[in-house]
Amino acid sequence: MAALVPDLPKVELQIVEMTNQVRREQNLNALRINAMLAKAARAYAERLARSGQFSHTADGGNPGKRAETAGYKPCAVAENIAMDRSGQGFDTGQLAMQAVAGWMNSAPHRANILMASATEIGVGVAKSPDPVPKYISVEMFGRPASEGVKFEVVNTSADIVAYRFLGKTRDLKPRMTITQSSCSVGEITFTKPAGFLSSGSEIARFSPENGKRYTLKSGVNGAISIEIGINIKSR
């Protein structure tokens, strides 16, 4: 019996659909297909299939460089690769399912699929010239530079304020300004540190927006307010 032969363009689309289904189940945004990421993924899948190599650095580069070569301007890039082999071949859905299932059963690959900051995806699948049917799948995730977040925090109050973003906390002294750039999404939290006669308390928290300035101001009875405006430098 002849080996099954999958429709590779349909396999690519089904991998995207399955990936987005997993993300939706985790309350994450669905990824949109980006032609440049797809170009990079296909080119690398074909290279791995031809060469017999299987790594993220088989071409001497890395996922970010491959994305840039294809014309993508990344803020963040991640990559999954899979190799599936069977003497019976694969039908279209089976090959897509096997690639995604393998990634989901691997912690680092699963983390890429569930990358909260990713907004775009490109998938490439290629057949190896080996006599036994073997397929290479490459899945690239990206967030373009145009979707990076840059904002400013200014402390005009008379107090030190703790500022926490993406797991890192800094103390903002009076008259201190911080400019933050990030490819990841997350909340920014402002807290008034605990004192000798008072416990620390949260002032406010936001999902920071690109180009915004968050200004801390002294209010009545020691209260601190936050004014949100446009950061002219980030326009």
Which positions does each model-derived feature cover?
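Beta-strand-rich domain onsets/edges
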Residues: 2, 139-145
